[in-house]
């Protein structure tokens, strides 16, 4: 690694992003419910992501990179929950959220391809920032929809308790996936001498498959009680 000196430092850098993101998603997801202003949080998130991801270009040591990753985690955490909620409320369909998540994988694919084409560890962050600016511009054309404010207290705890087994299985799954995908590019580059574009090819295979499978599965989702789905129980 050009910045981190050990796999442990890389793990800390990766974890800092996830830690900031989960806390921010929980808080701002709840705030978007209370304020019923999905588009505001989505657009603010795009702007902050453009700034924080662009700042990665200037991170030349572990400390600065951790700060940049924390900022990126906070910025992305502001927009993701409102975006999923907006997709559900705008689509009024049981498979819309799954379709949006599949396009999340497609976005990863496009970003990975861009990283491979750039083949530069610093330039890609400028490219990433530009993508977020484009996303913000597109978000300006999204129609405003009527959303009811959800002000019930203790709803997060209720959702977690109600779905504890689902959340536990997802947590275990993501722990394994994060561990594998954190170490894999290091292994490919240090032990097999892979170039950045070759690493991106491996990631493209994963994200392309995820996009196709998610779209296929979204058409088969059946939900009996839409209201319960909306509030997460």
Predicted regions and their residues:
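Residue-level signature of mid-helix packing/kink "hotspots" within the transmembrane helices
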Residues: 18-26, 108-109, 207-215
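Juxtamembrane intracellular "pre-TM" segments in multi-pass secondary transporters
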Residues: 142-172
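Helix-to-loop junctions at the C-terminal end of transmembrane segments
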Residues: 24-36, 212-226
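Cytoplasmic helix-loop-helix junction between adjacent transmembrane helices
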Residues: 68-104
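Symmetry-related core transmembrane helices of the 12-TM Major Facilitator Superfamily/SLC fold
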Residues: 124-140
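Structural signature of the two symmetry-related core transmembrane helices
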Residues: 40-54, 227-233
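Helix-breaking motifs and short loop linkers at transmembrane-helix boundaries and internal kinks
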Residues: 36, 58-60, 193
């Amino acid at each position: 690694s050009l910045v981190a000196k050990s796999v442990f430092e890389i793990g800390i850098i990766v974890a800092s992003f996830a830690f900031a993101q989960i806390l921010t998603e929980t808080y701002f997801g709840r705030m978007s419910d209370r304020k019923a202003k999905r588009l505001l949080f989505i657009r603010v998130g795009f702007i902050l992501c453009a700034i924080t991801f662009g700042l990665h270009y200037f991170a030349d040591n572990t400390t600065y990179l951790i700060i940049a990753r924390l900022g990126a985690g906070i910025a992305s955490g502001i927009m993701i929950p409102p975006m999923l909620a907006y997709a559900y409320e705008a689509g009024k369909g049981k498979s819309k959220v799954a379709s949006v998540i599949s396009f999340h994988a497609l976005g990863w694919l496009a970003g990975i391809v861009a990283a491979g084409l750039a083949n530069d560890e610093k330039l890609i962050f400028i490219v990433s920032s530009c993508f977020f600016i484009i996303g913000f511009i597109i978000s300006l054309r999204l129609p405003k929809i009527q959303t009811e404010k959800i002000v019930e207290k203790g709803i997060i705890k209720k959702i977690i308790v109600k779905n504890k087994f689902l959340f536990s299985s997802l947590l275990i799954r993501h722990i394994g996936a994060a561990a594998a995908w954190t170490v894999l590019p290091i292994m490919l580059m240090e032990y097999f001498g892979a170039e950045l574009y070759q690493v991106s090819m491996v990631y493209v295979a994963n994200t392309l498959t995820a996009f196709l499978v998610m779209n296929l599965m979204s058409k088969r989702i059946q939900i009996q009680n839409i209201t319960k789905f909306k509030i997460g129980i």
